[in-house]
Amino acid sequence: MHGRRHLAASLTRALTQAPSRSISSTPSLLQTLDPSVPSPSPPPAAEPGRLAELRRRLQADAPSLGDFAYSVEVGTRQRPLPKPKWMKETVPGGAKYAAIKAKLRELKLHTVCEEARCPNLGECWSGGETGTATATIMILGDTCTRGCRFCNVKTSRTPPPPDPDEPSNVAQAIASWGLEYIVITSVDRDDLPDQGSGHFAETVQKLKALKPEMLIEALVPDFRGDPSCVEKVATSGLHVFAHNIETVEELQRNVRDYRANFKQSIDVLKMAKEYAPPGTLTKTSIMLGCGETPDQVISTMEKVRAAGVDVITFGQYMRPSKRHMPVSEYVTPEAFEKYRALGVEMGFRYVASGPMVRSSYKAGEFYIKAMIEADRSKATTADSSA
C-alpha cells in the first residue's frame, strides 16, 4: 500500500512540475514551413481580473498547430496490444469436431463455442487430452436482448420467439452423442415474461429423461434477479448452476450491459444455493485483462466465496472484433497460477485459471465431474451406514 502511494505521489509531482507549453513559445507547423508567417500575439502583460487569468491559462494549455498535426499523423486511437506467445490458438479439426458440427447444423442448434468465438473450440469438440468431446449448447435462440461490451453474440430488443421444439431437439442431440457431461447456456431474454427460465428448465428435464446418468451444467443469465426464475432452473435436475459475474465489481458498468450488476449476480448465485437440492454446485467466471487491479480481483474473489460459490474460473479477455472493448493487458500465466492458488486457499472446491480458460472449459468439467461423483459416493456410503 505504501509503495503504491509513493508511486502515485511521485507521478503527481512529475505532472505538476512539467513545464507548460504555450502557443507563443512553441513554433507552429506553419511557421516551420514558412518563416514569413507571423507568430501568434502574446497575451496582454497585465489585464486585471479573473478574465485575464482565465485567458492566460487557456493560452498556456492550448496545443499548437504542430501538436495538432502530430496527433493526426500518429492517430488518436489506441493501438491494439500484440498477442503474447502463450495466447496462440489451435486450428479446429478432427473426426469428432466434424461430427459434432454436422449434427448441430442438421438440428439447427447453436453453440456458444461458435457464437462467442471461443479459442478452445477445437480442443473441446475434438476431445482434447481427456478424449471426451464437449460442446456448450446455447438455447433460446442466437440473439440476445443485451449488449455487453465483450460479447460477440447478436443483439436485438425484439429477437425471434423461442422455438417450442428446441428443448426436445437439444435433448435428442445431446443424448445421441454419448457424452457424460454437458453445458447448456442461453442468451438473455428480457423480452419474455419468465426471462426464458421455463424453456431452460424444460430442456434440462427432457435431457434427464433421456439420459438420467448424464451430468448437466446450466450456465444461466441473471433473470433480472427474479427468485422464481432462479428457483425454476435450480430445481430442474441440473448438477451445476453457473452464472458468470464476468469481471470485478468495480468494472461492471464498463464491461456488462447496464441491466446487469454485481449485486444482482451475487444474489442469483446465493438463491441458487438456497433453492437447489443438496450437493448442487454453484460456479462463476471472471475475465482478466479488462483493466482490473490485483486488489480488485482479490476483493471480488472474497465476495464470491462468501456467497457460497464452489467453483470459479479465470480466463484472459479476448476482443472478438474492433467493435468491442479493447484488451487492457495480457495477464501472464504466472499471475493466473497465483490466482488459482489463492482461490484454493480461500476455500473454493475447484479453480480453473489460465489464459485460454473459459467458463465452460472442458478441463474444468472433467474435474467437476469427479467432484460430483465423489459426493455421490459419500452420500451412498452414508445412506448405507444409516
Curated annotation (Swiss-Prot):
Binds 2 [4Fe-4S] clusters per subunit. One cluster is coordinated with 3 cysteines and an exchangeable S-adenosyl-L-methionine. PANTHER family: LIPOYL SYNTHASE (PTHR10949), LIPOYL SYNTHASE, MITOCHONDRIAL (PTHR10949:SF0). Keywords: 4Fe-4S, Iron, Iron-sulfur, Metal-binding, Mitochondrion, S-adenosyl-L-methionine, Transferase. Its cofactor is [4Fe-4S] cluster. This protein may be expected to contain an N-terminal transit peptide but none has been predicted. Residues 13-34 have a biased composition (Polar residues). Its EC number is 2.8.1.8. Residues 37-46 have a biased composition (Pro residues). This is Lipoyl synthase, mitochondrial. One of its GO terms (cellular component) is mitochondrial matrix.
